[in-house]
Amino acid sequence: KGEFDPEYDPKTINSRIRQILNIFEKKVYIGYTATPFANIFIHHEKKTKEEGLDLFPKDYIIDLPIPSNHSGLEKIFNIEKVDGDVVEDREIEDNHFFNIVKDNSLYHDDPDCAEGWMPPRHNRYHIPKYEYQKEDEVPIPPSLREAIMSFILTSACRNYRGYVEDGKSMLIHVSKFQDVQHIVFKQVSDFTDTLRARMQAGHYLHDDTISKFEEIWHKNFYIHKDKTEEKMPTWQDLLDHKYSLKFIVNEVCRNIKVLNGKSDDTLDYDNFVNENDFGLHTIIIGGDKLSRGITLEGLSISYFLRSAKMPMYDTLMQMGRWFGYRMGFDDLCRLYTTDNVIRWFFHISVATEELRNTFRIMASQGATPLEFGLKVRTNPNLIITSKTKMRNARKEQTSFSQEVMEIITFMKNEETVHSNFDTTN
């Protein structure tokens, strides 16, 4: 059954899985994924010579409930629903999780800008340089300085809360080019070394650096103390604790890592805590290697500037390492990124929730994916998944133009009825 697809050359892992399945007469294959976009576009009848039929989930797709302690798209964006349907067009509300970066390029609103510290368009020979730094400053933008200092503050707060032995990580993902990543590593190292030198000075409590730490703490974290059930230390608590700011700055300086194909750096949180009486405090710089397969324990601060002309839903989701379980420090997590990236993720969050809702409806009707039409919301600035995976998909546009729609169900909720009446009155 099924016809051969001569234009399809499956990837190695897909090929090997299918060849293993072909060995057995009775078999079960269950896929578990957070990005199901590519799976639903697999053709259910196309096959290849060596592998046979592809891995379309013909029997069922189950939407697993999101645990209450998981910080995912829906929670971060506070996705709004009305009677189960996602509210499509609304402004992204002020959310202290996001810090919009505008100083990474000379013209932050120009997607084709190639000037500045880390502009949207740069190549492997790019030298990151912030145009407006003072003569004695490290050439990184203020947003990255603040992000690094925020990481030091959140680490101090977590130590105060009793999570001393837990790993604490910051992610810096700004370029896909390994040579550029190593320059960023040098700049970040120089900046943290400067912080350490100032913190170790005898009069450090009167230094501008400590004043800046205090300002960031109150502006970005302590101001939200009434919105969390976790203990929120005062500024003095952070200074007086055994594992204080001064201690953390020193640890961070020793543990800045580059994770890419040219680096020998590794992450070993367990071994570190076994050799010390506290967890690893580390800043991790990288690119594509960080998108999957590497656990960033205790990730609280992410600085993410990757850009593409037409990014893919699933690739962006894999890069979004800030999604996950953040027990005891969910209120301290922050993402520094551009407003474009925020809009991309908001759209993906709406598209994902709509797809999950479709899976729930399909299951409630007892239908299978073979019987049920599955669709994913598109965006003119994004691609759902790779063109190879979408070769059997087709694009459709829905419109109510020249259509007569008959309403056969009515809302009972009094508030909804009054709202509809006011809207049409």
Q: Model-found features: residue ranges?
A:
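Subunit-assembly interface segments of extracellular/virion macromolecular structures
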Residues: K1, G31-Y32, T282, G287-R292, ...
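Conserved P-loop NTPase catalytic core
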Residues: G2-C157, S169, Y204-K212
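Conserved nucleotide-binding/hydrolysis micro-motifs of P-loop NTPases
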Residues: T35-N39, S68-S71, K176-D179, L290-S291, ...
